[in-house]
Amino acid sequence: MGGYAHQSTKTRSSDIGLTSKGKLSGYSAGFYATYMNDKPEATGPYADLWVLYQHFTDKVNPSNASEESYHSKGWTGSLEAGYTFGLKDWVSASGTQNATRLQLQAQVVRMGVRADEHIDAENFTVQGTGSGNVRTRIGATAYHLFTNPKTGRAIKPYLTLNWYHDTKNFGVVYDSVKDHIVGTRNFGEVKFRIEGKVSKNVNLWGAALYQAGSHSYWNAGAFIGAKVLF
């Protein structure tokens, strides 16, 4: 598997009033393997493994200095396992097939992407920290599948609750001064996702999430996507 990513960010310091813009672009390539049973009711155990090599170009543009550029690269790998329980199956009066499932999950991810050390516009050495972090996750997902057997279209809404633990803090060493993001070593997440099979080869999906940890840390996001099968 492979992919391309592009991200733009903007941060502002409430203490000194300065802003900074950032851009990241790059690629990933790797492989994955999945085990699951082929029961038509989609229940039972599963296991998922993937390994990726990632390479990015990072740019930072502070409001009070010139643009800085550096690279980040490394390997990331994940092992996930879980079990899906069938809660209820039925066919409605209109002929729509309904299936409700509960899936318990556990995952371990090693984050090996490391940012290159670089010199900023003021001639200070900057080095990111946190590479080699091992993130563990335990979670539960409940979903309901609506399938129209006549058209083949399907809709699947999900609700997921996760708990994450990191072994390292993510931060920066700036001219020998260390700082890191607080509140992210342990945090919870609630996520809502909906998938729709609009045709034989096209799937659309959207998701929204909210994360919260200690020290008033929080993060919210929304995503949309499409999958085309050839």
Annotate each PLM feature:
Residues 1-230:
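Membrane translocator/pore-forming domains, dominated by Gram-negative outer-membrane beta-barrels
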